[in-house]
Structures are given as C-alpha cells and as structure tokens.
Amino acid sequence: MTAKAEFGVRVPVSGPLASKENILSTTQFAEKLGFDAIWVHDQITWSREQNSHHVSSGSVEAVVEGANPDFYEAVTTLSYLAGQTHSIKLGVAVIVLPLRNPVVIAKQLMNLDVLSGGRLLLGVGTGAPLVGKSFETVGVPFESRGEITDDYLSAMLAIFDQSPKSEYSGKYAKFSGVEIFPKPFQKPRPPIIVGGLGRALRRAALLGDGWIPANITPAGISEGIGRIMEIRKKKGITTKELIVGNEIFSSIDKDSSIARGNASATIASYAKSIGRGSEEVTLVGSPSEVSKKIESYVGAGVNMFELKFIYKDMASLRFQLEVFASDVLRSFR
C-alpha cells in the first residue's frame, strides 16, 4: 500500500508570469483538481537580475528582458486568496522572519487563520544570502538573523498560545500584559514549519511542528529527521508527529524527455544562483517516474510536498497540474 502524502502547488507570486490573475487562476484550478494546498514565498526586495536567474515560478525561457521584477507580498496575497477559495490550505514557505515585527506579523497571521477557517500553513525561516539586500534595506543585521528568528518565533508562540494576556522577554522582542486577539482558529495554533538546513534543524526541533527543506535527497531527509528527533529526545520533548515537507522543482509529461527538456534550463540557472541543486533533487519525468521519486521521499519521511512546477506559460502549468492530479495525486490518497 502506497503511503499517503499531501501535495501543494507554488503559485506565481514571483517570476516572469507573476500577476494577480495568474495567482488566482492557479489557486482556484489547484483547488478544483484536489490539491491539498497552494504555497507562496516571501521577499521584500527583488532585483531584475534575481528575477531573471533565480526563477522558482515559471521558467527562465519565459523571462522578458527589462520587465519589472514583481514579487507579491505573502500575507496579503494569502488573505486575498482566502476570500476566493473554500477548502484548499494556504501555505507560505517561508516568511523571512527577521524582516518582520514579531507582534505585528503574529497579529496578521492569527487574523488570516481565522478568516480562512483554519487553513494557514506557516513556514518560517531566516533568509538566505541571496536576500541580503532586504536585510540592508529594512535595517536588520544579516549576521544575526538566526538568533533574531529564534527570538521572534518564541515571541510569536507566546502571542499564539497565551491568553488572555501575553508576555515575553527576549533579546530582540519584549512585551508584557498585552491582549492580542483574535487567537488562531487552529488549536493551539497553525502548524509552524521551519525551513532550512543546518541550525534550522534545532529550530524545528524546539520551536516548530515541522521542517521543510529544499534541494535535498531522500537520504538527506532521513538524516534531518533523525537529527530533529535526537534534539527533542535530549531536551525531554515528548515526540509528536512531525510534519516533513519538501520544496521541490517539478516537471511532468507523459513523455519524460519533454518533461526534462522543459525543466533543464531553469534547474541549471537556479542551481547556479544558489550554488547547489540538480535534477537528482527534483520531480522531473513521466507520471510513473515522478511517482517513484515521490515514493522514495515518502519512504524517507516526507508527508507534504510543495511542488514548484516549471512552465513557459500558463497553459503549460494547467496541463501539468491536470497530469499530476490524474496520474500521480490519487496514488497517494
């Protein structure tokens, strides 16, 4: 019997095909086809150069020289989509937490969870070197992003969990006796899924409900899960079910050569921009090939996928969503 997993689709909030219309149509089509979630990601500043080479929605072939590097903000976009959908989960992977005021973002996210009827999936992370300009612009020291993230996330947990009054005293966030409502629809809170590798594993173990890495092999997944569980055990934390995500490039076609041809340039460009990544850590191929790759990840412990489809136009995305839904999705239900 095939193990179960949830599947979500990254919608084009960035990249050459980013637009209000494309974000909404992709979300509603994914819901219609039975996908479990849609996902957005988060940046404050985003340059034309980044928009041309670091493409995680669309494809490099779709890039138009000189076009504005539109990047739709995560929380407001999910709030808009909450009002345009019925049941599909609304995920962000990940909020770059050091760039946000922890009290304000906690309030916004609680509100979003209530308005959506408990559909929020909350990914949090520190931000990578690629987004250093955002830290400079906002006035946050990039080298301190890890400890800021831990502090801010702890502060947010105090707001989510404590009632009627919340208090927290940390290095970067302090408040006492504050009443912040409404509290989240989901109890005790939306699932907190920590992005990243290395030190992020400790953050996921101690402050999160899950972990979502990217560009990682099944063996890397198994190793990361083992490390998280080891940290929890040493801290005396009763092991609870762990959400294990995988943010992964995807390209599917009945003809595997077409799927690979569709994806190769974008995967190569993205790998060059971050210094790692290859087809080995993607879901590229025919439905049967993609299903086998998914099985290997599920066997390693993944129970939730954020699919970053590669597509030159919206017709290509719709086609791939249909193929995935009909030939792959149902096998993991």
List where the protein language model places each region.
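Active-site-adjacent structural elements that line small-molecule/cofactor binding pockets in enzymes
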Residues: M1-R333
